């Protein structure tokens, strides 16, 4: 059942849909996280996986940065590997390491053993979405999932990887096994996002954290068709959809195609290595842009932050003049744990004043 709210005055939704917002909208990837003392207090009593499968904790953690910073959107607190865990894959999130898979997926038999995501396994996530949409007032809620390629990399490597050698070896050397794996993970991603959409999220963002390790040719051949299927499946909901990766300057056009083929409103996330104006010339016409302050800037003191924030806002305006449908201010990746929350709040206030 569609329980989506009407939020006609949301600056975030306006910019994401290509309409002129009343102000430049701003939110931050990883805005709910270790930079916040209230988050650290909750996490001291709960593991990451416990937090990701507890509706009350998901709700509270998601709300924390909205209360503190006054951002223009909340993003559902979760982790990229949550749908994998919900599908029965044995894994854990190890502090200071990241997701660790008990039995890496390396063969066709391993791929065949991946189970579909059963809706009841993510009921706490759906419940949290319903609680959040009731609590957020006029602030939109962004749903969250990892893209099939990034999920595949975690599964094949067994955890985080610098070179993704096992992943690329399967992709290039065993393409039938690779596409079977990507198809299974695309189904898992669709099911996880569909659960969030049905529960009432106002937008979604798909994180392809490791896509930047690929050439454009390999991305088009081995990844794009599967990512496009995710967006095509979610398009009937009509919510804005964002596609984000790190180090993806050469992939921005293809990543925007993944959404554009669905016909739904599309936003492409841009990291700090690429100017927004340059990105506007790379993405499909009609795409909005999101980004792209370097997260490290927030550690450099307020005078540096202020100059950089003003530069990003101006770059966003030039990008819109160059053809981008809109601009959502964000970082080029997640908020770093050492970031002073007061600097984040001041950044929101500054963006809103410009």
Swiss-Prot record:
It is an enzyme of class 4 (lyase). This is Uroporphyrinogen decarboxylase. GO terms for cellular component: cytosol. Pfam families: URO-D (PF01208). Keywords: Cytoplasm, Decarboxylase, Lyase, Porphyrin biosynthesis. Pathway: Porphyrin-containing compound metabolism; protoporphyrin-IX biosynthesis; coproporphyrinogen-III from 5-aminolevulinate: step 4/4. Belongs to the uroporphyrinogen decarboxylase family. Catalyzes the decarboxylation of four acetate groups of uroporphyrinogen-III to yield coproporphyrinogen-III.
């Amino acid at each position: 059942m569609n329980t989506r709210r009407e939020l006609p005055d949301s600056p975030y939704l306006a910019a994401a849909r290509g309409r002129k917002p009343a102000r430049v909208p701003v939110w931050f990837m990883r805005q709910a996280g270790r930079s916040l003392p209230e988050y650290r207090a909750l996490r001291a009593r709960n593991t990451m996986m416990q937090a990701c499968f507890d509706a009350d904790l998901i709700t509270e953690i998601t709300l924390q940065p909205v209360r503190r910073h006054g951002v223009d959107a909340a993003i559902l607190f979760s982790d990229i590997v949550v749908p994998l865990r919900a599908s029965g894959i044995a894994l854990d999130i190890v502090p200071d390491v990241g997701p660790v898979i008990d039995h890496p997926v390396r063969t066709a038999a391993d791929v065949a053993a991946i189970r579909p995501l059963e809706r009841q396994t993510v009921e706490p996530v759906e419940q949290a979405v319903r609680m959040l949409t009731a609590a957020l007032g006029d602030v939109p809620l962004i749903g969250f999932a990892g893209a099939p390629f990034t999920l595949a990399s975690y599964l094949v490597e067994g955890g985080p990887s610098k070179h993704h050698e096992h992943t690329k070896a399967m992709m290039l050397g065993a393409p039938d096994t690779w596409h079977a794996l990507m198809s299974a993970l695309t189904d898992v991603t669709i099911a996880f996002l569909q659960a969030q959409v049905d529960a009432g999220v106002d937008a979604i963002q798909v994180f392809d954290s490791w896509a930047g390790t690929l050439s454009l040719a390999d991305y088009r051949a081995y990844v794009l068709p599967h990512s496009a299927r995710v967006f095509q499946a979610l398009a009937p909901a009509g919510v804005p959809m964002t596609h984000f990766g790190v180090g993806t300057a050469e992939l921005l056009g293809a990543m925007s195609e993944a959404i554009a083929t669905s016909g739904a409103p599309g936003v492409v996330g841009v990291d700090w290595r690429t100017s927004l104006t340059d990105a506007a010339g790379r993405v499909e016409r009609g795409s909005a842009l999101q980004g792209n302050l370097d997260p490290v800037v927030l550690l450099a003191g307020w005078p540096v932050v202020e100059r950089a924030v003003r530069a990003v806002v101006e770059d966003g305006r030039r990008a819109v003049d160059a053809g981008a449908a809109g601009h959502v201010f964000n970082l080029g990746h997640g908020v770093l744990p050492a970031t002073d929350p007061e600097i984040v709040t001041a950044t929101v206030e500054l963006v809103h004043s410009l």
